[in-house]
Amino acid sequence: MAVVLASPAAGGVAAGGFVVRNLDLFYGTHQALHQISMTIPERAVTAIIGPSGCGKSTFLRCLNRMNDLVPDARIQGHVSFRGQDLYAPGADPVEIRYRIGMIFQKPNPFPKSIYENVAFGPRINGYDGDLDEIVEGALRRAALWDEVKDRLRKPALTLSGGQQQRLCIARALAVNPEVLLMDEPTSALDPIATGKIEELMTSLKQEYTIVLVTHSMQQAARVSDYTAFFLDGRLVEMDRTERIFSTPSDRRTEDYITGRFG
């Protein structure tokens, strides 16, 4: 893995937790990402937008090495978080994924109780403290405690779709991550459940770095502090969200946001 360091991106983006430089990703002979360079600030919501197939989710998976699990995937370039090269020899992908959690498009609770879903991560990591405290704290941070506190031993699959997604967020929070990667976390949810997840993101960014892939321009505008526009596996531009949506630097960004394509 080549390590290529550079100064943070221009355009009002603060120095932050992730530094990505000259990132290429290949699936076999197909190149999915081309020379991505960006800085993702800590304790903010950064939205990744762009048309289907532009590389948004592929890029997101580079941030916690989920692409390692894809056959024939190959990566070149530099990805670091808080100064640690995530692809350095000896870097532990499992430890990285605990620090940098992932929330998927479709809620994926384990076929266990609500309690056991949240307790699972700390338990397999050998936590010997008060699991009840961990579970309650994670559920409170995920804004789910008041809805489930009287049925913690009930199957997680009895929850609504929106509740299941917040349970998955609580499960990620239970192992004390530093980052939440969210891959279209509300695309399968109704407007009310979507609103609760968006409120949760706004609350959680006080403690966590959040990177959000979304197809919804309205959602990106509502919840994100920074927005990056991807097209054909390339980063077109990244800036503060209000500037991206009001005065983007690139005509292609304006065309996408205004619905001329995508």
Swiss-Prot record:
Q: Does the keyword Transferase apply?
A: no
Classify the protein's membrane topology as the record does. Peripheral membrane protein
What GO molecular function annotation could you give as one example from this UniProt entry?
ATPase-coupled phosphate ion transmembrane transporter activity
The EC number(s) attached to this protein equal: 7.3.2.1
The gene that this protein is the product of is pstB2
Q: What is the role of this chain?
A: Part of the ABC transporter complex PstSACB involved in phosphate import. Responsible for energy coupling to the transport system.
Q: Which organism is it from?
A: Symbiobacterium thermophilum (strain DSM 24528 / JCM 14929 / IAM 14863 / T)
Please identify the protein, giving its name as recorded.
Phosphate import ATP-binding protein PstB 2
Listed under GO biological process in this entry are:
phosphate ion transmembrane transport
Which residues does the record give as ATP binding sites? Answer: G50, P51, S52, G53, C54, G55, K56, S57
